[in-house]
C-alpha cells in the first residue's frame, strides 16, 4: 500500500544553488521482511537529505496502478518510470544525482553487515550495460560504492552489471541502488540509510 507522499519543496522557479537530488522507485511496491515498501523508504531518504540541506524531488504517484490502467505488466514498469523521469526533467531541469531506489532478493547471509552490535542492510549499485551511458554510470557507481564503504567498510556489495538499460540512458548521473533485500527489516534498512546519507553529505555528490 502506498501512503501519503512526502511533498518536496523543490520548485521550478527556485533553481537551487545547493545540490539537487531526484529520488524515485520504479518498483514502488517492493517490500522488506516486515512489509515496509521501498517507496516508504524513499520518502524517508528524501526527508533525511532535505534535512541535510539538499534540494530533493521525490517522485510521487502510483506506478503500478498506472501500469494496470494501461494494460502493462510488472516487468514493464520501467516504461512508466521513464515517462515520469521525462516529465520531471522537463519541469525541473537536471539534477546532481538521480536515484532509482530498489531492494534486492538475496539470502540473509548476503543481506547483512554486523558492526559494533548494529545490523545493517547491505547495499549494491546495478548498472545497465545496454545503456548508452553505461561507462559513466559504472564509474559513478564505483565511486559511490567506495565512498559509502569508507563510512562503513563492507556495507556495499560489488557493483552488479546486467544486460539491460534501466532508463540509465536518460542521464549520466542516474544510479540504481539496491538498498537491502527482502530478508532485511526496516530497522536494518534505516541503519543503512544513515550511512548512505553520511556518505552523500561528505563528498558523495560531485
Regions found by a protein language model. Name each.
Residues 42-46, 79-86, 138-145, 190-193, ...:
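Extracytoplasmic/secreted envelope proteins and their assembly/folding machinery
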Residues 1-24:
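Non-catalytic propeptide/linker segments at domain boundaries
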Residues 107-133, 141:
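A short, glycine/acidic-enriched catalytic loop
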Residues 28-36, 45, 67-76, 127-135, ...:
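Second-shell loop/turn segments in exported
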Residues 34-112:
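Catalytic-core regions of hydrolytic enzymes
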Residues 158-206:
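Active-site-adjacent mobile loop/cap segments within catalytic or ligand-binding domains
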Residues 20-25, 57, 97-102, 124-126, ...:
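Soluble periplasmic/extracytoplasmic beta-strand elements of cell-envelope proteins
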